[in-house]
């Protein structure tokens, strides 16, 4: 495999733009042979209501080696975190770089080389000599500029920096936004947060900080929980010097997984939210490697089910069979194994190494915070107090409060651009 190979992770829920996203990203790559796409297609497999999603046969066009597919009936979809976990577990085959995007994107020409070059420009201090070295744990991430259907791409390429915008009233999870940078950047600038719709890094991130398949039906909370997990595992966030990818912010043309909203689904979503509350109300200095021993059987069972499911997908893709539903029952059954300690999830109860709570929810080590840095470290770094739900000026301006007047585009110009294409 080429040393510059890129694995592109895409999840699509009944999205007619996915096919054109795949076509665009391959056509505009400089080295098309280095691009390998793993896509989870969630659509109606029982009728032709989603035929619009398959006007372009990308699997036939590019081959099954370059396009790896999980097919799932849309009624079995369990939200973005679950789908992204399936793609990581079943379709990744050791490519060097990892690009995670949404199913409605457009790219600049030679985007593959641009992203690799910018990733290699990310530098961090060298503790040995006081100089700077390439950051091997760098992640390029931001909310991309928007595009309009069918292919209206803006001519400007302004960088976008992630900022904290507030806490959700219903769930209490941090919301993120994007501010347009007017300052000319020579190299990628440090960022405080991570987002799921554009993330480019070395592929070791898949094994180091994998998606948690137990966060079923979760939407808000995905990005800030991954931000905290990645940061505490030693990863650093950067915004590219210019726009490399575009996102369709208008959702009117497509369905979302929220169309399936039974009482059972609502309960599973609430359990996912509780998992994140546990994550943000623990002291990760008390997370130890022994937790993994308690979870080996659960994780092995989960992996075996995923492997079996992947084999089924490979054998049945052409028949459009639903090959992913068995994984969800495996994940749910594993979540029920707990030691019933009924520990409090508050920050003060720091003896809870297994991270159980009154609901029997347990966060396995590989889906937990890291040990390289603490959650308090991340709170100080990003300017967000997760316990008291406050944001200081550092968080509101993405770490560039002191130079905000010269770093960011003025609010009127930013409003005009956002109203035209969105961010």
UniProtKB/Swiss-Prot annotation:
Name of this chain's protein: [Skp1-protein]-hydroxyproline N-acetylglucosaminyltransferase
Gene Ontology molecular function: acetylglucosaminyltransferase activity; metal ion binding; Skp1-protein-hydroxyproline N-acetylglucosaminyltransferase activity
Domain free text: The C-terminal 65 amino acids are required for catalytic activity.
Subunit record text: Monomer.
Temperature dependence: Optimum temperature is 30-33 degrees Celsius.
Catalytic activity: trans-4-hydroxy-L-prolyl-[Skp1 protein] + UDP-N-acetyl-alpha-D-glucosamine = O-(N-acetyl-alpha-D-glucosaminyl)-trans-4-hydroxy-L-prolyl-[Skp1 protein] + UDP + H(+)
Gene: gnt1
Keyword Magnesium: yes
One protein family per Pfam: GlcNAc
Keywords recorded for this protein, A-Z: Cytoplasm, Glycosyltransferase, Magnesium, Metal-binding, Transferase
Misc note: Present with 4000 molecules/cell.
Pathway: Protein modification; protein glycosylation
Known EC number: 2.4.1.229
Record's compositionally biased regions (Low complexity): 286-358
Cofactor(s) it depends on: Mg(2+)
Localization: Cytoplasm
Organism annotation: Dictyostelium discoideum
């Amino acid at each position: 495999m080429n040393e510059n190979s890129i694995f592109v992770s895409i999840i699509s829920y009944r999205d007619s733009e996915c096919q054109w996203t795949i076509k665009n990203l391959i056509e505009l790559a400089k080295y098309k042979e280095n691009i390998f796409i793993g896509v989870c297609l969630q659509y109606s497999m029982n009728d032709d209501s989603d035929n619009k999603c398959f006007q372009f046969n990308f699997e036939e066009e590019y081959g099954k080696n370059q396009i790896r597919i999980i097919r799932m009936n849309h009624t079995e979809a369990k939200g973005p975190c679950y789908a992204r976990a399936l793609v990581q577990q079943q379709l990744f085959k050791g490519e060097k770089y990892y690009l995670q995007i949404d199913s409605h994107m457009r790219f600049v020409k030679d985007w593959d080389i641009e992203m690799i070059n910018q990733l290699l420009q990310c530098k961090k201090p060298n503790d040995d000599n006081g100089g700077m070295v390439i950051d091997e744990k760098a992640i390029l991430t931001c909310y991309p500029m928007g595009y309009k259907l069918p292919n209206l791409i803006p001519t400007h390429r302004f960088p976008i920096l992630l900022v904290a915008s507030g806490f959700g009233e219903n769930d209490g999870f941090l919301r993120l936004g994007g501010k347009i940078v007017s300052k000319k950047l020579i190299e990628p600038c440090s960022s405080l947060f991570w987002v799921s719709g554009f993330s480019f890094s070395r592929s070791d991130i898949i094994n180091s900080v994998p998606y948690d398949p137990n966060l079923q039906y979760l939407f808000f909370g995905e990005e800030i929980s991954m931000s905290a997990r990645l940061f505490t595992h030693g990863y650093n966030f950067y915004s590219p010097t210019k726009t490399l990818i575009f996102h369709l912010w208008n959702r009117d043309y497509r369905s979302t997984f929220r169309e399936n909203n039974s009482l059972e689904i609502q309960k599973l979503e609430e359990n996912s939210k509780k998992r994140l509350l546990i994550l943000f109300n623990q002291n990760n200095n008390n997370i130890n490697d022994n937790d993994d021993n308690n979870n080996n059987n659960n994780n092995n069972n989960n992996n075996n089910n995923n492997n079996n499911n992947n084999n089924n997908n490979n054998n049945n893709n052409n028949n459009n069979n639903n090959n992913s539903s068995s994984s969800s029952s495996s994940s749910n059954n594993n979540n029920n194994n707990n030691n019933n300690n009924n520990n409090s999830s508050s920050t003060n109860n720091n003896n809870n190494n297994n991270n159980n709570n009154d609901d029997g929810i347990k966060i396995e080590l590989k889906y937990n915070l890291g040990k390289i840095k603490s959650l308090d470290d991340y709170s100080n770094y990003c300017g967000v107090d997760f316990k008291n739900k406050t944001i200081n000026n550092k968080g509101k301006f993405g770490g560039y409060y002191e130079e905000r007047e010269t770093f960011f585009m003025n609010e009127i110009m930013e409003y005009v651009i956002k109203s035209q294409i969105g961010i």
